[in-house]
Amino acid sequence: MLSQYMEEFEQEPFEVGEFIERLTWRTNNELQNSEDFHPVALHDTFIQTIKDLKILQEKQQSKCERLEESLRQEKESHAKKIAKLQERHQTAIDVFGQLDEKINSVAGKIMHLGEQLENVNTPRSRSVEAQKLLNFMSEFLAAGPVIVNDIFADAARLSEAADVIQKLYAISQDLPPGNFAESKRKIEKKYDEVERRLIEEFATAQKSEDIERMKTLAQILSQFKGYTQCVDAYIEQSQMQPYSGKDIFIGIVPLCKHHYEIIQKVFANPQQVMSKFILNIYQLKLHQYAMTKLEDKKDEEKYLRTLYELYSRTLKLSTDLQIYMSTIDDDLLQKLTQQIFIKHLAGYAEMETKCLTAKCSTELEKFYASKKHQKTATTKGFRRNMEVLIATRANINIAAIEDYGGETFLSEELAINMLQEAKASLKRCRLLSNETELPGNAIKLNDILLRFLMHEHVDYALELGLQAVPLAEGRVFPQLYFFDVVQKTNIIVHLLDKLCHTSVIPCVSNTPKYSDYVFKKRILMEQIETKLDQGLDRSISAVIGWVKVYLQYEQKKTDYKPETDVDTISSAACLQVVQNLQPVIVQIKKCVDGENLQNVLTEFGTRLHRVIYDHLQTMQFNTAGAMCAICDVNEYRKCIRELDSPLVTQLFDILHALCNLLLVKPQNLQEVCTGDTLNYLDKSVVRQFIQLRTDFRIIKNTNYLKGIIE
């Protein structure tokens, strides 16, 4: 039972209430009739359980005491062991200190002994070396030919021979020239021979890329006067093979990267050697390559493209190679690049302007030749003005208007070609012009573009377009092509603006030339806008003039004053006018853009309103005719809705309200006149329309018009 209690106590978490519940449940289950409650049995069970728990507590207490005693004894044992270990550790520290003192003492004696040995050995070594050199010197001092020593004849002992001859050469430089001239000549000859053999050996090692051997030989040669020959030999042999076929630029950077790693390992002064390596590429390889490519100047366009490509690729190459240059030579590559191209850059600007002029002129000639058109000097509108003056005063048409079959003589393709040529020229200009000449050169190129594209092409087309606009108040509906001229002009101007912002302005911004550029462009745009406005005004006048003449001759008096009742429909003249105006509105909306579109549509609508208003003022209206007039005005209103102009819509709404004055009964005139639409109009306008009624003489003396015509 005690073991069962222990199992329950060891469960986590232990709940006293649950333990008592389980004990009560077990007691009830042990009885025969478990449904009855037996308090006595339960009491006995609790008493027995309490006794068992006390016994269990005593056992556990005894077990704890034994474990605590065992722990105390083990702790004392470990403490004694630690104390003994500490004593032994201290003893070891003392012994180590004594040993360290002895080692330092022995080391000091050894160093002292080594110094003494070195002091004794150094003079001896020098003496041996001096004796060795004297033996070699005696051979060179002896009369007759030099007896070739083994050290100079054995290729395996080349390094040793180089050391000897270098020292002998240094000694010989201090000998007086008189008695020792022959000996000095022999030494110099052998010196040159050994030096040549070293360079040849270095070249052989370079071919097999034996880095260690090259490094050793370079160190030896660094003591010789021909060390630069070693560097030159390395550079010459490294750059002997073609870099990359016909395109020299592709192989230069990989070549430099490869040899930079070798130079770093081989030479003691790698930065100077690498600078000379790159210098040789620029002064020999690149310079010769550029001269070959640029020797033919007959095809100027090809020459300029080649110059730009070579110069830009050389600049990029300089940027890529800058990491291999020392800080002292920071601007060396830039100077080398200028030396290569200086002759070509000097005459660049003149050739560029000449080439662009020729290209633009050729494009213009090809365009007009394709149109079979011979350019002629325009009369600047003088003839046109005379025709208008004579036609107005004499009421005759003295000559037919030449409209060239609707040809605008404007070409977006031509403009794009010219702009592309100018863009390429400006791109070259930004790269090939120096900082002080760039703004002036860019302005010259821009002037050429403006001359050919805007003055000789667009302005010429505008002049022809202005002359081709039909005269106003013609009886035949005018064929209008100037709107197409406007559309193409706008496209060309937008393309020009885009080019200027991307290619011209960056060249002249923040310079005195910028104000010159802005002034020229403003004058040019003002001239273009003036002619566009003039042409649009003439075109609108031609259409509105035709409406005026057409209504004047085709609108019958009986349309608005029929003698018999007729169907209430729009007049034929009105329908014809609307039919002709709708395509014009569509064409205007297609060809004009921006704020100009709204201005043109509003101007068109207001002039149309004035013509129709004046036309209605010439008519007399009875009731049936007034209905017809209202139908006509409604047709006009439908037409002008496409103008999207609030002002024009309002004008025709008022005109519609005025036409209602022709229809309403006399007793309702006061009410209509005081309505929202007509209330703010001048009474004279209202009075003029009321006077158009056929019954006006009857009603003018009645009270119906009181306050209106007074």
Curated annotation (Swiss-Prot):
Organism (species): Drosophila melanogaster (Fruit fly)
Keyword Acetylation in record: no
Short name of any one Pfam family annotated for the protein: Sec10_N
GO biological process: exocytosis; Golgi to plasma membrane transport; neurotransmitter secretion; protein transport; symbiont entry into host cell; synaptic vesicle docking; synaptic vesicle targeting; vesicle tethering involved in exocytosis
GO-annotated cellular components: exocyst; presynapse
Superkingdom of the source species: Eukaryota
Family matches, as Gene3D superfamilies: 1.20.58.1970
Subunit structure, interactors included: The exocyst complex is composed of Sec3/Exoc1, Sec5/Exoc2, Sec6/Exoc3, Sec8/Exoc4, Sec10/Exoc5, Sec15/Exoc6, Exo70/Exoc7 and Exo84/Exoc8.
Keyword vocabulary terms for this entry: Coiled coil, Exocytosis, Protein transport, Transport
Protein purpose: Component of the exocyst complex involved in the docking of exocytic vesicles with fusion sites on the plasma membrane.
Coiled coil spans: 44-96
Protein name: Exocyst complex component 5
Lineage: Eukaryota, Metazoa, Ecdysozoa, Arthropoda, Hexapoda
